[in-house]
Swiss-Prot record:
GO cellular component, one term: cytosol
Gene Ontology molecular functions: DNA binding
Matching Gene3D superfamilies: PDCD5-like
InterPro entries: DNA_bind_arc (IPR022889), PDCD5-like (IPR002836), PDCD5-like_sf (IPR036883)
Keywords associated with the record: DNA-binding
The keyword ATP-binding is assigned to this record: no
PANTHER family reported in the protein's UniProt record: PROGRAMMED CELL DEATH PROTEIN 5
Organism in which the protein naturally occurs: Pyrobaculum arsenaticum (strain DSM 13514 / JCM 11321 / PZ6)
Family note: Belongs to the PDCD5 family.
UniProt protein name: DNA-binding protein Pars_1791
Pfam families: dsDNA_bind
Highest taxon above the source species: Archaea
Length: 110
């Protein structure tokens, strides 16, 4: 077998693997976008416009906190533990609870 044929096969195999990786990545991104759209639709049904605006503002500043807050809101609403629609004041109370759970505490030793 010629050396060029081996290199061509190896190159083709690398291309095929790279294409598979890109396709998997694109599929994962598509699934993430679908999940985000479904969460957004659920939040629009659960939250008042003022509360939704507050959540959007939180998302700009602290995306990880907003994600935890979204999960908590959806869980509370689906279990019936909170009255829907959730107004801004109720959202603030939920935010306090979630923030206290997710807040990182830093300790410094001297």
């Amino acid at each position: 077998m010629a050396e060029g044929e081996i290199e061509d096969r190896e190159l083709e195999e690398l291309r095929r693997k790279k294409l598979e990786e890109l396709q998997k990545k694109a599929e994962l991104e598509r699934q993430a976008q679908i999940a985000a759209a479904q969460r957004r639709m659920a939040l629009k049904r659960i939250l008042t416009p003022e509360a939704l605006a507050r959540l959007d503002n939180i998302r700009i500043v602290r995306p990880e906190l907003a994600e935890a807050l979204e999960q908590q809101i959806i869980a509370l609403a689906s279990s019936g533990r909170v009255k829907v629609p959730i107004d801004d004041n109720t959202l603030k109370k939920i935010l306090e609870a979630v923030y206290s759970q997710t807040r990182k505490e830093y300790k410094f030793r001297l």
